[in-house]
Amino acid sequence: MNKKSKIYIAGHRGMVGSAIHRKLLGMGFTNIITRTSTELDLRIQETVNEFFEMERPDYVFLAAAKVGGIMANNLYRADFLYENLMIQSNVIHSAYATGVKKLLFLGSSCIYPKLAPQPMKEEYLLTGLLEHTNEPYAIAKIAGIKMCDAYRAQYGCNFISVMPTNLYGPNDNYDLQNAHVLPTLIRKFHEAKQNGDPAVT
């Protein structure tokens, strides 16, 4: 990528998307496109197609997703599956249709089997049952990975996937009911220290 390449960051307000945005700005990239979910609903194919046709980005970081902790994943199973499948499918296909040079899709560690040997290796994907509580989210993420693979194989697209795991940081969700494990623990430890509590449960 050169400094004037047109770069679209889908999900620029989330933890990973905002980190990518900050890093690119810090490196001197000046042609970065962002849209909030209110400005561009990635679940609607027609609006995504129109956006890509109008903007024609050279590079895409696909960090947009419906995310949440164990409780949210287990309660809103259909929403997590449907919304993530729609976001991924619409962005990946529109990137192909408009000739995006490279797309980076963000997967998740939950794509690996619940009982995968430790430490986990890439080849363990699809070798066992997934954790039930976040299975719909994991299935959607697996579909995104396989979609990138399929578009690369059939159309020669430079679409790749990465699995950022056990992340926390600025713009993360620290809500005790909906956050992932690490931010939840950080919040509990922080509150315990502030309150002088001897232990965390």
Which residues are covered by each model-predicted region?
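Conserved Rossmann-fold NAD(P)-dependent oxidoreductase catalytic core, especially the SDR/UDP-sugar
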Residues: 3, 89-134, 160
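Active-site helix of classical SDR
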Residues: 136, 140-143
